[in-house]
Amino acid sequence: MKVDFSRGQWDNAPLTYAYSFRFQETPVFAQEDDCIVNRKNDAFEQGFDNVTLMAEQPCAAGAAISATCSFEAYGAPLFVIAEKLHRCPDGTLRYGDYLEVVLYENGVNVWRMKMTDGKVRWVKLLGAEFPVTAGERHAFSARVTKTGLVIETCGRKFTLYVEDMYPSFYLGVSACEQINRFYDMEITEE
């Protein structure tokens, strides 16, 4: 599945909004001519909308997600790899056990998020430090294997072992912290 996020180009894409159980808000991306973008939102605890678009169908080991993205200072465009999507009574889709593969000014972080006692808790699995320029477009990808992740961006490649990797999962893009733009997204399966 390849999606161009330009205006009018992704209206029928098999994507759905989904949200972490960490947050109550359910914002959507704003449309710009050549991309989608999250917005400043003073009502949100971080001051910006935290928005995720997920593929509607689950994937298995061998699947990869890639995107062209950019971010303003302190932004954090990321991939979400969610074990399950839960339909809440209000119809909203949410996820609680998931991985975040985050691109930001100081490199790449990977976080494992787990729902415990009704709260999402997290642990950092990877902190690879290198400069990533805000305001520029970056190609970013993550392949899910049976035992972890292979991440590529900015001419660098990282292989990360992830204990108890999900046998099936949902993939998506998410805008977190500050302003983030996604120009395209592709999900491939082996």
Model-based region annotation:
Residues 51-58, 126-132, 160, 171-172:
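Beta-strand-rich interaction surfaces with strong enrichment in secreted/lumenal proteins
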Residues 30-31, 103-104, 144-146:
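Generic beta-strand structural signal
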